[in-house]
Amino acid sequence: MEKKESLDSSLKEIVSVCKRRGFVYPGSEIYGGLSNTFDYGPYGVELLQNLKQLWWKYFVHLREDIVGLDSSILLNPKVWEASGHVSNFNDPLIDCKNCKTRIRADKFLEDQKGEGFATGLTLEKMNQVIKESNFACPNCGQRGTFTEARDFNLMFKTSHGASAEDSLDIYLRPETAQGIFLNFKNVVSTTRRKIPFGIAQIGKSFRNEIMARQFVFRTREFEQMEMEFFCEPGTQKEWFSHWVNYCMNWLTEQVGIKKENLRVREHEKEELSFYSEGTSDIEFKYNFGWGELWGIASRTDYDLNQHQKFSGEDLKYQDQVQNKKYVPFVVEPALGVNRLFLAVVTDAYEEEKLPDGETRTVLRFSPKIAPVKAAIFPLMKKDGLPEKSREIFADLSKLGNIEYDDGGAIGKRYRRQDEIGTPFCITVDYDTLKDDTVTVRERDSMSQERIAVNQLKNWLFERL
C-alpha cells in the first residue's frame, strides 16, 4: 500500500507541475471538464512539436528508405472490416450492477491478482475468477455485483452524410496504420520506391477506452507516430531487430531518456494482437510502473492481403531485380506521442535539495527537446537594459523558442525557468552596457559564466 501511495503521489507531482507551468490543462475546464480529455498549453505544445520534429528528422529526413504521408482520419468503413478491427478490436468489459461503474475486466484482475495474471484468459475464465473471488467494486465497495464479462469494441462510431437517409455509419480511426496500407500502391507508383522501404506518418487516433487513466498515458483521443516498413518475406526478422535497436537508440541518444528507465519486453504468444506474429514493447518506468511506450510489431502480410481480398485490388509488389511478385511483409514501430510526452517529463523531473536547505523543482530536458531554448532577463526595467535585452532576444530567436522575462527578482525568474526546463538563462546587467558581455546561467549545474554578446549566438547554437 505504501508503494502504491508513493507512486500516486509522484504522478500527482508531475500533473501539478504540468498544470502550474502551462504544459497540460484539463479539457473543457470552465464547463466542469470532460473526463480523460486534456489540452496542451504553451509549453506543452512546444515540447510536443520538438518531439515530433525530432522523430520526423530521424525516421524520414535522415533515411533514404522512408517517405512521409498524412492520411485521412475518416475511412471507408469496409477498411475496418478488412483490417479485422470490427470483429477483433475488443477489450473485456464488466459492469457493477449497484453503481453502474464500467471496468475493464483484464486490468481489474491484474490489479487484484498481479501484473500478467489475465494474459491469455478467456472471457469464461475471467468470469470464473471474478465470481469465485467475490471481489469488491473499486467504486462502491459492494461484492458480488459484477455482470458477466463481454467484448466491448473500442472504435468510436459516427455518421458520414448530411441526412439520415444518406448517412453512412463510419468510425474514427483507432490507428494511423491502415491509411498507410491503403496508399502502399500509390506511394510505390509515384515515388518509385524499391523494397525495402517505409512510410511514416504522425496523426490523431481514437479509442473508446473502458478505463482511460493515468493522466495522458491512456486517453481516448491520442496522437501516434507510426511507420510501416515494407520488406521481402523472409527478411522481416532482421528488420524487426533493426527497428527495435534503432528506436531504443533514438530514445536514449536523441531524446535523452535515461537507459535505466527503459526496457524491451517481448510479448507472450497469448497477448499478441490479431495481426502480429511477434511484438516487442519498449517500456518506460512511469510513476505508476512499467508501461508500453513504443510497440514494434511484425505484422506479416496480414494487412495488405486483407485489403487485397476485400477491395479486389492487386497490392502485390513487382520486384524487378528478382523478377517476381509478392505481398510484402511489414514491420511496424508505433509510438504514442502523448506517452512519449509523459515519459520525457517524468524522466526529466527532479526535486533537488540545495545547499541552503531549499528545494528547487527542475525539468532536465535535453536542449534538443526543451520547450524554451533560452530566457533573456534584463536585470532592471530601466537605464537601457530592456532595449539591450530586446536586441539580444531578437537575434537569438532565430535559433528557436526564446523567452523574454522581466518580471520579479532574478532568483524567482531562474526557478520559473527551471520548472519549464529552460537550459540557459541570460541576464543583461549594467556590465553588459560597459563591456558587451552577459551572464549565462546553466540549468542543471546552476553555474554561471560571462559570454561576449557577439559570441552568444554561436555559443548557444553549439549547445542546442
UniProtKB/Swiss-Prot annotation:
Molecular functions per Gene Ontology: ATP binding; glycine-tRNA ligase activity; protein dimerization activity
Swiss-Prot/TrEMBL keywords: Aminoacyl-tRNA synthetase, ATP-binding, Cytoplasm, Ligase, Nucleotide-binding, Protein biosynthesis
Catalytic activities: tRNA(Gly) + glycine + ATP = glycyl-tRNA(Gly) + AMP + diphosphate
Coiled-coil zones: none
One BP annotation, GO: glycyl-tRNA aminoacylation
Key word Cytoplasm present: yes
Subunit structure: Homodimer.
Family: Belongs to the class-II aminoacyl-tRNA synthetase family.
Function: Catalyzes the attachment of glycine to tRNA(Gly).
NCBIfam families: glyS_dimeric, PRK04173.1
Name of the molecule in the record: Glycine--tRNA ligase
